[in-house]
């Protein structure tokens, strides 16, 4: 089991697919990593040598923000918006949709389950 960026990536899968198990690396980034390190995308993780795994690990550490660091960075960005008191920060603070969606109906995921109102039933 290869361990990259603190994640055990599956050994039976192809390298680009396995790399997407790391938070912050999607399909495009995974293919770019394979190309940069010189690994054929059709190879499987269990076929890689230790040197190739090390090269992938070093490339990711040098060029990508992944896992805990990425989560912390996103969390700090949201906190910064909330501290500024800008519109987006207020929407985050009130647990409402941030990107302009309507809230008269819908937005149930963000707002939570509907609250019962007394006398509303017909």
Swiss-Prot record:
Name of the protein: Small ribosomal subunit protein uS13
Highest taxon of source: Bacteria
Disordered: annotated span: 98-122
A GO biological process held by the record: translation
Bilayer-spanning residue ranges: none
Keywords from the named record: Ribonucleoprotein, Ribosomal protein, RNA-binding, rRNA-binding, tRNA-binding
Assembly: Part of the 30S ribosomal subunit. Forms a loose heterodimer with protein S19. Forms two bridges to the 50S subunit in the 70S ribosome.
GO cellular component: cytosol; small ribosomal subunit
Family: Belongs to the universal ribosomal protein uS13 family.
């Amino acid at each position: 089991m290869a361990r990259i960026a603190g994640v055990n990536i599956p050994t039976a899968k192809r390298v680009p697919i396995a790399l997407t198990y790391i938070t912050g690396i999607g399909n495009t980034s995974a293919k770019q990593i394979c190309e940069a390190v010189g690994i054929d995308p059709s190879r499987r993780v269990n076929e890689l040598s230790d040197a190739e795994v090390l090269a992938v690990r070093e490339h990711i550490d040098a060029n990508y923000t992944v896992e805990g660091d990425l989560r912390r960075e996103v969390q700090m960005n949201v906190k910064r918006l909330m501290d500024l008191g800008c519109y987006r920060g207020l929407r985050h603070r009130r647990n409402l949709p941030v990107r302009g969606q309507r809230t008269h109906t819908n937005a149930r995921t963000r707002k939570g389950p509907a609250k019962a109102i007394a006398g509303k039933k017909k």
